[in-house]
Every structure is written in structure tokens, then in C-alpha cells.
UniProtKB/Swiss-Prot annotation:
GO biological-process terms attached to the record: acetate metabolic process; acetyl-CoA biosynthetic process
Gene: ackA
Statement: the UniProt record of this protein carries the keyword Nucleotide-binding: yes
Protein name: Acetate kinase
Entry EC no(s): 2.7.2.1
Quaternary context: Homodimer.
Positions bound to Mg(2+): 7, 388
GO MF annotation, one: magnesium ion binding
Binding site for ATP: 14, 212-216, 286-288, 334-338
Taxonomic source organism: Nitratidesulfovibrio vulgaris (strain ATCC 29579 / DSM 644 / CCUG 34227 / NCIMB 8303 / VKM B-1760 / Hildenborough)
Site positions per UniProt: Transition state stabilizer: 184, 245
Length: 402
């Protein structure tokens, strides 16, 4: 079966059509700047494979429906298409940010599921409305085709109350559902399953610390194959220092800044989400630019690098304590998979925990799951490339199979 995976943003649609018999993407792409005077569509045929072909188009897209119609035209094009017509698509899997406590696993989209997504718009004001728009577009363009929602928060629903509750008045949780939800769950779940396969260990016996490090960063403590804690909270702002997000700070800083800088709640939110993290410390949110600046003696870039890796190291220690026994520390996503400097610095000084990195292995980049720890290490340190689209497609099939 071919599964179309959709990740709908407020002004974008990211998509991938996957042949699930071979687990190979037939095409992928991104529609950008929806609603602006001029939009852009980047479409790849046979992505990440020999003979990959990239097509780029610039045209206005008034709304998500227009953008998705153009995608369907490309997928089924007589010359460049990868399928003959829409009937060769068996199901659609949607990435959805927040399903709250009501949705603990991937679900077939119906009125109830859409209602839950709407109910959590106050906690996911940017993503949930956009995700819902993507679902409604798919329902319009592919009538009768099953749509499945795969939620970023699913994997973390196994956390115990002691991990997900905040020490605020309990009435605020009961009334407003203020609690830790966690995000990047689709990636953490994929990495957990892939690590079990790679190590040849039963999933229900696997204890690992997963480190999803990209422009957004999160970690998870996984015990017996299930998440027991994660760094992101009620929003993706909590936890690690990120590209533009501050991560953990003293909450009293927020009202202090609002008073001293005369900031509105929205302005304070923008400061913490868009102007902080690596960008706030040194003006750069791309780790590659930061490394170049460090090499040229930029002290703020060096400090930002040290802060970034220090906070990851702290959470490794905390999650080691939570798990008691750790089979592996696993790095994934853009920085986690490709940045040997970050991995080396994070693991430096953790020998007493059985965590160490072999410099030669750490320098290898081959796109495959691999050890970067020395032979005989008590804890394996791994690089495992993530594949959220494949995980969404697999979850979609699992729901349809019942």
C-alpha cells in the first residue's frame, strides 16, 4: 500500500508518499508561503536515492487546498508522476502536534478526533489549527480515503503522574489540563524501536536515553520500551536549550521581563520561543554557523556551544538516575546525527557512568545506525537516524489493520 504522509503547518505543507511494501519514499516535497503573494513548491522524485530528481515551482497558493491540489497533480503527472492516479494511495497519515490525555495512540480521524484537536488549540495555537486544516484538505481532495492522526504527544502518555504533573495547585491540572505532554514523540518512538532492532534486544527490556537534537531539541527516558520522562513540557519550550528557544529558565524571569521591558504576554512568548537559545546567546541558530564562528575565536559562540552541550549532559545524568540501568544513549535528528563535536562534548567526562565516545567512530557519517562508543563500554552510545515520516506511515497501517 502507498501511504501519503502530511505535515501541515500554518503556511506550509510537508508531504511524502511512501511505498510501504518496500518502505521506500516515492516522492516528497514542501509547499511554502501559502497565503503570500508568491508561494514555492519543492518536489523530489525518488528522494535520497540514486537518480533523485528535484523540481521547483514558484506560484501563488491562496490556501492549503490549492497547495495540495498542485501536489496531487505532480504525484500523478503523466510524465513525472510516481503513480497513475489518486486511487493508488491507500491511506493518509497526518502529523498532529497535541492530542492531550484523550488520545494515547494513533487514531482514525473522525468527528471525535477532530474535536479533540480543536479542544487543544489553546495549548497548541500554532500547530493544531494547521494540522486540522491539513486533515480537512485531505478529506476534501480524497473523499472516502482513511485519514489517521499520529500525535507528537502519544509516546509520552506512558509517563507516570510524578513525571508529568507540575507542582502547581492541583486544581489547575483538573480544570485546565496543565501538565507535561512532551513532543517529538514520533521520533522518540521510532528511535526506540530501531534501537531495539539494532541491539537485538526485546523492546520491553530496553532502557535508553534518546536525544533528538535539531533546531528543536528534546530528550526522553525510556524504560522497558516506554517513555517515563521527557524534557519538553506543556509546550515545546521547556527543557533543553535550542536553536531559538530558551528551554528551562526560572519562571519568575517572565513577569520580571514583562514589567521591566514593558512586554505583552505575546511579546514575552516570542522572546522565549523565537529570540532565545543559541540565537539569543550569539546571534546564530544554525550549529554549523556556530562552529565556524567558534573556530574564528567568537567567544559568544563558544559559550553558546558549551551551554547547549552542558544542558544535554545534565539531563543524561538525571535520566540515568531515573532509569537505574541504561543500555544506550542514542543521538538523532539533524545535530544528533551529524555533529560529532556536540556528541563528543556531551559525553565527555561521563566515564564514571560507563558512557564514552570513540573519536574515530564518532567522526564517521554513513546514514546508518552505528556505535560511536568504544568496544566493551558499559553503555552503548549510538547514532540512529530518525524517520518520522516512515513511523507515521507505519502507525497509519497499524490503525487500519486494527
Amino acid at each position: 500500500m502507498n501511504v501519503l504522509v502530511i505535515n501541515s503547518g500554518s503556511s506550509s505543507i510537508k508531504y511524502q508518499l511512501i511505498d510501504m511494501e518496500r518502505e521506500v519514499p516515492l516522492c516528497s516535497g514542501l509547499v511554502e508561503r501559502i497565503g503570500e503573494p508568491m508561494g514555492k513548491l519543492t518536489h523530489k522524485i525518488r528522494p535520497d536515492a540514486e537518480g533523485e530528481e528535484k523540481l521547483t515551482f514558484e506560484q501563488p497558493f491562496t490556501n492549503h487546498v490549492e497547495g495540495m491540489k498542485r501536489v496531487v497533480e505532480l504525484i500523478t503527472d503523466a510524465d513525472k508522476g510516481v503513480i497513475k492516479d489518486k486511487s493508488e494511495i491507500g491511506a493518509i497519515g497526518h502529523r498532529v502536534l497535541l492530542g492531550g490525555e484523550e488520545i494515547k495512540q494513533s487514531v482514525r480521524i473522525d468527528d471525535w478526533a477532530k474535536g479533540v484537536i480543536r479542544d487543544y488549540i489553546p495549548l497548541g495555537p500554532l500547530h493544531n489549527p494547521a494540522n486540522l486544516a491539513g486533515i480537512e484538505v485531505a478529506e476534501e481532495l480524497f473523499p472516502g480515503l482513511p485519514n489517521v492522526g499520529v500525535f507528537d504527544t502519544e509516546f509520552h502518555q506512558s509517563m507516570p503522574a510524578k513525571a508529568y504533573l507540575y507542582p502547581l495547585p492541583i486544581e489547575l491540572y483538573e480544570e485546565l489540563k496543565i501538565r507535561r505532554y512532551g513532543f517529538h514523540g514520533t521520533s522518540h518512538r521510532y528511535i526506540t524501536k530501531r534501537t531495539a532492532q539494532y541491539l537485538g534486544k526485546p523492546l520491553d527490556e530496553l532502557n535508553i536515553i534518546t536525544c533528538h537534537l535539531g533546531n528543536g531539541c528534546s530528550m526522553a527516558a525510556v524504560k522497558n520500551g516506554k517513555c517515563v520522562d521527557t524534557t519538553m513540557g506543556i509546550t515545546p519550550l521547556e527543557g533543553l536549550m535550542m536553536g531559538t528557544r530558551c528551554g528551562d529558565i526560572d519562571p519568575a524571569i517572565v513577569p520580571f521581563l514583562m514589567e521591566k521591558k514593558n512586554l505583552s504576554p505575546a511579546e514575552a512568548d516570542t522572546l522565549m520561543n523565537k529570540q532565545s537559545g543559541l540565537k539569543g546567546m550569539c546571534g546564530m541558530n544554525d550549529m554549523r554557523d556556530l562552529h565556524a564562528a567558534r573556530e574564528n575565536g567568537n567567544e559568544r559562540a563558544q559559550l553558546a556551544f558549551e551551554m547547549f552541550t552542558y544542558r544535554i549532559k545534565k539531563y543524561i545524568g538525571a535520566y540515568y538516575a531515573v532509569l537505574g540501568r541504561v543500555d544506550a544513549v542514542v543521538f538523532t535528528a539533524g545535530i544528533g546525527e551529524n555533529d560529532d563535536f556536540v556528541r563528543a562534548e556531551v559525553c565527555a567526562g561521563l566515564d564514571s557512568l560507563g558512557i564514552a565516545v570513540d573519536p574515530a567512530r564518532n567522526a564517521v557519517r554513513n546514514g546508518q545506525p552505528r556505535h560511536i562508543s568504544p568496544d566493551g563500554s558499559r553503555v552503548a552510545v549510538l547514532v540512529v537516524p530518525t524517520n518520522e515520516e516512515l513511523e507515521i506511515a507505519q502507525a497509519t497501517l497499524d490503525v487500519l489493520k486494527g
